[in-house]
Amino acid sequence: MNVTSFAALRAAAQDIVDEMIADPYGLTSPSVYETARMVVSAPWLEGHRQRVEFLLAQQHEDGTWGGPAAYGLLPTLSAVDALLSVAGTQDARRVAGAVESGLAALAGRFPRNVELPDTIAVELLVPWLIEQVDQRLSRMDDRGDLPGRLDLQADTGTLSGIRELLRQNTGIPEKTWHSLEALGAPAVRSGTVTPMGGAVGASPAATSAWLGDPPHTDAAKACLAYLHQTQARHGGPVSGITSISYFELAWVVTALSGSGLDVDIPAQVPDILRTALGANGLSAGPGLPADSDDTSAALHALDLLGKPESVDCLWEYDTGLYFTCFPKERTPSTSTNAHILVALADRRGQGDTRYDHAAERVGGWLVEQQQPDGRWMDKWHASPYYATACGAAAMARLDGPRTSAALDDAIRWVLDTQHADGSWGRWEGTGEETAYALQVLNHRAAPDRPALEAIRAGRAFLSGHVEDDRRNPPLWHDKDLYTPVRVIRAEILGTLAATQRLAEAEKEARA
């Protein structure tokens, strides 16, 4: 693609929209954690051999699976447990070698009291899988050089409490359905859990856990169809969350609508989002609980499309200081509050001072969450560049010295952390993180020479990798890290378009 051509950018963006409309699930990368769970719980499901092969192929040279540092713990536990479950049944030598190196990595690369990343249900899933692996090791007749148990802490107190609720046929929080696989036998066909469209919590692993082992009755047809469809999307491996259709619609619309790309957004996009909005807002996709992050993003997308809806559904998430994503959540989200501020700012000047006051209050809270070096961090993404792009966009919607200074600090941090090849990234330069960094720089109305040079170098990196999804590793938080593929493509294309004017200004300045 000639990425310097605005027409080519627009055509690529239109392709994303057209693909999105045709796909009811949303496109996310396959998950090591989730695929391993399916190896254990659904060996009867089509694609089992391919799922085992996927696990073997995804192991890193150091024996781990998944993301860097502590992000690798959960997927490594899940993969080791899964491969122990198939030991001796498929490609025995490779499986045994993968298990041995995986166990060595668990012993040598993760301290006993490792600080866990704030991924979904990590406080339930890690203790559960430590328990599972320990049980498998203890049952082995001939372990050889394998350890008898893992030297990792496994506090299963919270997990046991939720399991007991299921045993007593007491309802559990709907957000827990997404990780139902950790709850064991009480989860099988639990009457307190209701599949939607065949899916439990938009998760293949949770759906399989609810179904249980064959034989399955006719009542399970929708769930079986869901599992067959989700495994077919990647040829056996599965994504950790399916569907994310509302999330994908809202984020893609926002990324493209603010870029100057005149893409054709069909009327069914706002229709879908408006229909999904309820008294509590909407969720990332069907079968998930409503949350304020997806709700505020959808409200902003609808505003951009000229189809504004009331933001009153957001008030129930308001704590008086900041907004929660879900009721009774463990940690607040900076990116969510930034999205809410933007949605509230869309309504400023319309006669209801609640919007103005809430936007100012949330803006003050966001300023307090900013790190001393100028970045923000967030619980929905591994990279500070995502949170900082969200925070900067929120700061740009407010007036006043505090928010202006916060935006300046964010810009300064971005300029200070650019890599030599023009990219940005927490661990390595990625297209996604480079797009976020450029978005931050684009908030300065009249960038100085260093900022213009940084934008030029960043655009050059993006232009060279715009069609290379390999430069977009999983960074988003689910149970493990994942990539929302179309969202990232839209962010990159939209950023290239939105920064074209500044790139031309930098070129003129050098002439």
Swiss-Prot record:
- GO annotations under biological process? antibiotic biosynthetic process; diterpenoid biosynthetic process
What cofactor does this chain's UniProt record say it requires?
a divalent metal cation
Motif DXDD motif per UniProt: ranges: 291-294
EC number, UniProt record: 5.5.1.13
Q: Which domain of life is it from?
A: Bacteria
Instruction: Answer whether the UniProt record assigns the keyword Hydrolase to this protein.
Output: no
Q: Which GO terms describe its molecular function?
A: ent-copalyl diphosphate synthase activity; magnesium ion binding; terpene synthase activity
The annotated dependence of activity on temperature is: Optimum temperature is 35 degrees Celsius.
Note the pH dependence of activity: Optimum pH is 5.5.
Q: What are the alphabetically sorted keywords of the record?
A: Antibiotic biosynthesis, Isomerase, Metal-binding
At which positions is a divalent metal cation bound?
D291, D293
Looking at its record, which EC class is this enzyme? Answer: isomerase
Q: Which InterPro entries match?
A: SQ_cyclase_C, Terpene_synthase-like, Terpenoid_cyclase/PrenylTrfase
Keyword set includes RNA-binding = no
Give the pathway annotation: Antibiotic biosynthesis
Bound cofactor: record note: Activity is highest with Mg(2+). Can also use Zn(2+), Co(2+), Mn(2+) and Ni(2+).
| Catalytic reactions on record | (2E,6E,10E)-geranylgeranyl diphosphate = ent-copalyl diphosphate
Q: How does it assemble?
A: Homodimer.
> Member of which family?
Belongs to the terpene synthase family.
The record describes the protein's role as: Involved in viguiepinol biosynthesis. Catalyzes the conversion of geranylgeranyl diphosphate (GGDP) into copalyl diphosphate (ent-CDP).
Q: What is this protein called?
A: Ent-copalyl diphosphate synthase
Q: Which organism is it from?
A: Streptomyces sp. (strain KO-3988)
